Amino acid sequence: MKFSSTTLLAGLSSLTATVSAGCSFEGGNYYCSETKKVIYKGIGFSGTYMDVTNMDESTGKCTQQSYSFSGNLSPLDEELSVHFRGPLTLLQFGVYYPSSSGNSKRQIDDQDCNVKHVHHKHKRATEVVQVTQTVFVDGNGNTVTSQALQTSTVESSPAVSSAAADDNANSGSGSGSSAGSGSGYGSVSALDGEGKAYRSDISTKSAPTSTSAQPSSSETASVDGAWTRDSYYTPGSTDNCVFLNYHGGSGSGVWSAKFGNSLSYANADNSGGSSTPVPLEETTIKSGEEYIIFSGSKCGSSSDCGYYRKGTVAYHGFKGASKIFVFEFEMPSDTNGNGYNQDMPAVWLLNAKIPRTLQYGEATCSCWKTGCGELDLFEVLSSGSNKMISHLHDGQGSSQNSNNGGGGSQDYFERPTSGTFKGVVIFEGDEIHILQVDDETEFGSSLDEETVNAWLKEAGSVATIGY
């Protein structure tokens, strides 16, 4: 890469602004001010990424083709999966759509979608794979492992509503067979989600870091009408959503020597796989452990989800340019270990095509590297830190087929090491609002227009995009 004197001066200017703004440098990242809200404005662009069209289980090679997108929030208007990394306890999760929206992924006739009650760096798509565990699948199908930016604080103003845009589903077909030895064991990659949460060369430590108070340069989105809850979880109960993890070959999903474990149904405490969908009990997952929430709607045989790995557990994500995610969680400290991602919890969104192919592993086996979309909502970047940041990884502001664009804020949310954190993420128009709400906030069966617009109008830290 070439560096000009202009680039050097810009970097020095940014560093000077950071210091003068009173930002701190901790664990390789800059942090500025605590915030209750981060706002992304002007999100969505016309571009392309490389979509997976086939995965060869025998060679470990994948093929791709260019996929075009455009519109508000694109590519994040496509189906998204919701990811969690420990140490974390999830107490509530929900997804809302405008009451007049057709984006619901509820299948009334599918038994997997019924309400179920039982007793009670970034993380994801790294390019380099490290073998971290050896996995044995016993005769009962159980998995046994051996461990071998510039930000500004603004006051939002009301504005006219923006129309929602539907995403165009990409379709594909593929072949491949599940490979494996008769004894069903082998070394696999990152079964428990080990790997940096995000690529270091596009982390927030390289973003502009000054913080200044100035009025908003554009109006803020508003909504018309109520929002209806489409998916919901509390411990031991799921409504139109499903918990998955990476224990493929243990009750559900598949395993192969080249691609390792596919997605599987998670068991009740996320310690392994399951043969059927099971609601997660109230459980605290340990550092490095992960699970994923998808909608309760299975992908069909007609490739309505686009291409996905043969034999994997495949469900639709949460689509649309107008949607709201709600969360309640704890992120307790976990000092009992020294592994990668130790005591670095996170909550983030991925283009749902990524986990349905290969979240961790060969870069050409998912669309992540080429910019199909990741949004970090609440992420701890260094071990033991009490600061959670948000960051967007896609190609906006960068070249085609790249995730070197995006951006974020270096203002941070306080990590809930004791007590719970209630968070709301609103996708509307060309904006994304991520905010902490009061502990008394209830996530009922619907959200009224007044409540959502009040959240949108709250002041917050505005993220810089395309630096």
UniProtKB/Swiss-Prot annotation:
GO terms for molecular function: hydrolase activity, acting on glycosyl bonds. Its EC number is 3.2.1.39. It is found in: Secreted. Its main location: secreted. Residues 1-21 form the signal peptide. GO terms for biological process: cell wall organization. A motif (ExDxxE motif) lies at residues 374-379. GO terms for cellular component: cell surface; extracellular region; fungal-type cell wall; hyphal cell wall. Residues 173-185 have a biased composition (Gly residues). Keywords: Cell wall biogenesis/degradation, Glycosidase, Hydrolase, Secreted, Signal, Virulence. PANTHER family: PROTEIN TOS1 (PTHR31737:SF2). The conserved ExDxxE motif might be important for catalytic activity. Belongs to the PGA52 family. Probable circularly permuted 1,3-beta-glucanase involved in cell wall modification through beta-1,3-glucan network alterations such as increased branching or remodeling. Plays a role in engulfment by host macrophages. This is Probable circularly permuted 1,3-beta-glucanase TOS1. The lineage of its organism: Eukaryota, Fungi, Dikarya, Ascomycota, Saccharomycotina.
